[in-house]
Amino acid sequence: MEKLTEKEKELIRVSWESLGKDKVPHGVIMFSRLFELEPALLNLFHYNTNCGTIQDCLSSPEFLDHVTKVMLVIDAAVSHLDNLHTLEDFLLNLGKKHQAVGVNTQSFAVVGESLLYMLQCSLGQGYTAPLRQAWLNMYTIVVAAMSRGWAKNGEHKTD
Ligand code: HEM
């Protein structure tokens, strides 16, 4: 696993904390952007609620639960910046689960772009080039582990 510099860790920790305790509204900004960039992802959420339009989906409790889960994973990564490898098994498993529900690894990159978009909206002037790079580096580590799990699950299915 790649390592982050101490400066990058500091930028990530301080900016994440500055978003406040309730991360869900920031997650909603992130997913609104994701669906703008890749509307087909809406179809992967097979909840009872009608997820026909972006607005229907974004306001459904099940969907907000998923947003909460995503923010908790990011929160776990931010809390483990010194030892991200301890999340490896969890992230492998998460990648496997997403392979099973039909998410492509290319979409993980679009999630990354949406995460940066959310940070830009939420941090305003605080969104600087080094901060952007720090988050991108962390997200790349998380997604690399998820993608390894995704690939393992894919292999399994074709055995
Ligand atoms: C490409 C965009 C994504 C789509 C379309 C997607 C879709 C889904 C779906 C359909 C489920 C199963 C239903 C549910 O639990 O709500 C799920 C579960 C989950 N997702 Fe995602 N997801 C995406 C990205 C992510 C990302 C980036 C993370 C975290 C970094 C994440 C974290 C989770 C977690 C923690 C679960 C619960 C897994 C479990 O049941 O153990 N998802 N996702």
Swiss-Prot record:
Location of the Globin domain: 3-151
PROSITE patterns: GLOBIN
Pfam short name (any one): Globin
Catalytic activity: Fe(III)-heme b-[protein] + nitric oxide + H2O = Fe(II)-heme b-[protein] + nitrite + 2 H(+)
Coiled-coil regions, chain positions: none
Function text: Monomeric globin with a bis-histidyl six-coordinate heme-iron atom through which it can bind dioxygen, carbon monoxide and nitric oxide. Could help transport oxygen and increase its availability to the metabolically active neuronal tissues, though its low quantity in tissues as well as its high affinity for dioxygen, which may limit its oxygen-releasing ability, argue against it. The ferrous/deoxygenated form exhibits a nitrite reductase activity and it could produce nitric oxide which in turn inhibits cellular respiration in response to hypoxia.
Protein name: Neuroglobin-1
Source organism per UniProt: Oncorhynchus mykiss
Lineage: Eukaryota, Metazoa, Chordata, Craniata, Vertebrata
Gene name in the database record: ngb1
